[in-house]
Design a protein with these regions (language model features):
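N-terminal alpha-helical transmembrane segments of multi-pass membrane transport
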Residues: 65-74, 81-86, 90-117, 124-127
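N-terminal mitochondrial targeting presequences
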Residues: 47, 51-64, 508
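Glycine-rich phosphate/pyrophosphate-binding loop and the adjoining helix
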Residues: 197-199, 203-253, 260, 266, ...
Length: 508
């Protein structure tokens, strides 16, 4: 069997091109086709003159074939202003161009309350099944929100629930536009910050100590109890016990190194292991083990590296660097430093956020900001808003880009199976009978669409069309109305730019 597979793989180059010709004879005349790199699509219809006064959706449906996305994606709807923006993005930038199988989950606060938050768990489980989720910003209720919506309980953060189920790392990265000034002007390249999304302060147990007494920490283990003296209180105070686990730290290391390698950027881990010698030291040791075992050779081949640094040293380096690296942070450090980076690069509204599993297979993408409540209050009253939708648009593009990668892996297996079937049909008796019904397209074209949508956003801003938050960065807090667009006008401007880009040759 092994020899059969080896022989089939050796002949895969010839057989793949033969299969393409079998499926589509017109491909024979095309020189130098790329093997396993997408398929060729029908020629787009192009008009020599523009069609005026036509809706973008109508125009694109007539002019451009929709890209078929072969496998499902999970969509998690959200709350308030971002929910309104989410619908505009889908209606104007996504559904007119893509044929999607969407597994929809409403994570709006009222539906979470109605389902006792089960919908959040179900959406995370669906993400594990389908490998890609795209999430709208959601409300994490506090006491005020509980009263506002009449909630049954103060439900946990949906992001926290999803992170714990996916057990991954949150990576945030700025979206750069040449005309948007940066508070840290030396940051010429993005900095991708990875936040370990498990344990530490976010799963800690804390307590108020009401009076004098000894605080001890104990664990019941098979070899006998372990007991540690923590502090001898002389009066009232506070105490905290927190933890992490090797499995999650290792997954954090794997996903961080996978992200750095994908970007071909160096990777830095920051801890305070000089103080927390065992706790933070465990992070340092596991990262080094994973690097030595799996990644060192690959990193060195591409002239990138992994390095551990103390958190205070790393913060100082970050401020004076020009960017272009991945920064792996523990949970609390990542929470704080990601907002610092966002502001340093200009705006939290220009920050992507993806949650990547340890094996790199499952990804959840979202905007790094909240639900923009202040704008939503104006929106409810029918007043004009100018809300930045770029991070939400990039949530879609980053999720779709990952969907393409997953499809491509599946496609490689499909192509190999097809090649084997031609020489050894007895291995896959049903394969040849199903060949004419197989649809293996969408890979490179989906990636091209994602890249063009991102480019459309950036070029729209760089052309001077932007929302108020970005206009303030350029013109100051008293910016006049002529310098910015409202929420829907900006999305329309991006859609117009995207329409033009989709008529041009592929970027990939």
């Amino acid at each position: 069997m092994i020899r059969v597979l080896q022989t089939a793989m050796a002949g895969a180059l010839n057989l793949s091109s033969s299969y393409s010709a079998f499926k589509n004879p017109s491909l024979v005349s095309i020189s130098n086709p790329k093997l396993f790199n997408g398929v060729l699509f029908k020629t787009r219809l192009c008009f020599s003159t523009r069609i005026s006064n036509a809706s973008i959706r109508c125009f694109t449906s007539n002019a451009i074939d929709k890209v078929r996305v072969q496998n499902p994606i999970v969509e998690m709807d959200g709350d308030e202003m971002t929910r309104a923006i989410w619908k505009m993005i889908k209606d104007k930038l996504i559904f007119p161009y893509l044929e999607l199988d969407v597994k929809y989950f409403d994570l709006g606060i009222l539906n979470r309350d109605a389902t006792d938050d089960k919908v959040t768990v179900e959406s995370a489980e669906a993400t594990l099944k389908y490998n890609v989720a795209i999430k709208c910003a959601t409300i994490t209720p506090d006491e005020t929100r509980v009263k506002e919506f009449g909630l049954k309980a103060m439900w946990r953060s949906p992001n926290g629930t999803i992170r714990n189920i996916l057990n991954g790392t949150v990576f945030r990265e700025p979206i750069l536009c040449s005309n948007i000034p940066r508070i840290v002007p030396g940051w010429n390249k993005p900095i991708c910050i990875g936040r370990h999304a498990f344990g530490d302060q976010y799963r800690a147990t804390d307590a108020i100590i009401k009076g004098p007494g000894k605080l001890k920490m104990c664990q019941k283990i098979g070899e006998g109890p372990m007991e540690l003296d923590v502090y001898d209180f002389k009066g009232p105070g506070v105490a905290l016990a927190m933890y992490n686990v090797d499995q999650s730290i290792r997954a954090f290391a794997e996903s961080s190194m996978a992200m750095a390698f994908a970007k071909k950027w160096p990777l830095y881990l920051s801890t305070k292991n000089t103080i927390l010698k065992k706790y933070d030291g465990r992070f340092k040791d596991i990262f080094q083990e994973v690097y030595e075992e799996k990644w060192k050779e690959q990193f060195e081949e591409h002239s990138i590296w992994y390095e551990h640094r103390l958190i205070d040293d790393m913060v100082a380096y970050a401020v004076k660097s020009d960017g272009g690296y991945v920064w792996a942070c523990k949970n609390y450090d990542g929470d704080v430093q990601s907002d610092l980076l966002a502001q340093g690069f200009g705006s939290l509204g220009m920050m992507t956020s993806v949650l990547l599993s340890g094996d790199g297979k499952t990804l959840e993408a979202e905007a790094a900001h909240g639900t923009v409540t202040r704008h939503y209050r104006l929106y409810q009253k029918g007043q004009e808003t100018s809300t930045n939708s770029i991070a939400s648009i990039f949530a879609w593009t980053r999720g779709l880009e990952h969907r393409k990668s997953v499809i491509k892996c599946n496609r490689l297996l499909e192509e190999l199976q097809i090649c084997i079937s031609f020489q050894y049909p007895w291995l896959f008796p049903n394969r040849l009978s199903n060949l004419t019904g197989q649809n293996l397209d969408g890979n490179e074209k989906l990636l091209d669409f994602s890249h063009k949508l991102e480019a459309a956003c950036i070029e729209t801003v760089e052309s001077g069309k932007m929302t108020k938050d970005l206009a303030i960065l350029i013109h100051g807090p008293k910016v006049s109305r002529e310098f910015y667009l409202n929420t829907e006008e900006f999305i329309d401007a991006v859609a117009h730019n995207l329409e033009s880009k989709l008529q041009s040759p592929s970027l990939v």
